[in-house]
């Protein structure tokens, strides 16, 4: 920072926008340009929606399940062994030993149900080491996972139906 230049906390705000030039079409902005100017790109309505929508979905998922007596759990993401049989895993060097990134919280959710917790959920990262050689395949994503005791599969279907309707209604009413 140049100390000879006076610093100010002032900002410029505008109540309106007016285009100074006329254009018949919007310019094409490449992904490389967008990534090179990431802070500007993140200010666009589209990119802000990319951040906002998953945040709302996770919030409403959590709220809905909490109202239906679910307990939120947080399961380990580094494990001493592969948790899913036959699937590829991410092997991580961990203080001189091997560890693996968790593929899902399934084992821990089942343990909670067996321990009479009845209803549990987790929002957290999931890692899949499947080599699909496609840009459309995610090896890491945020999972919205739930587990519950049921007497009939209609119990689960009814809960999930209500939850999805709730989430989509909130998205439509607040942001649609």
Predicted segments with their positions:
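Class II aminoacyl-tRNA synthetase catalytic cores and aaRS-like
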Residues: 1-176
